[in-house]
Amino acid sequence: MSELARVEAIVRPFVLDALKERLTELGVGGMTITEVRGFGRTGGKTETYRGSSYVIDFVPKLRVDTVVPARLVDEVIAAIREVAASGRIGDGKIFVSSIAQVVRIRTDERGEKAL
């Protein structure tokens, strides 16, 4: 069985198209996108609407999940940072974890072949 890794990135929504394009160029075969809301070290943010200030506790983000061969993890991380990093608070986070097994339900392919 080959070594596989899940790369999960929490990013600003407007980077999705560029991120999809960049990861596809690397050979990433698929990804799952989930709309999420959260806050980090700085908490929420304050926005003004029609002269009134509102505290937004949870900021909208996207979670991009993909499973790749472990040998591609550093390239995938670099690609995500290339597209998503602005240098400002709120750029997001990347989490990497090991995947024990992947099975394509339709064909019963396993491991890297299932990606």
Regions found by a protein language model. Name each.
Residues 1-115:
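Positively charged, small/polar-rich N-terminal and surface patches that mediate targeting and assembly
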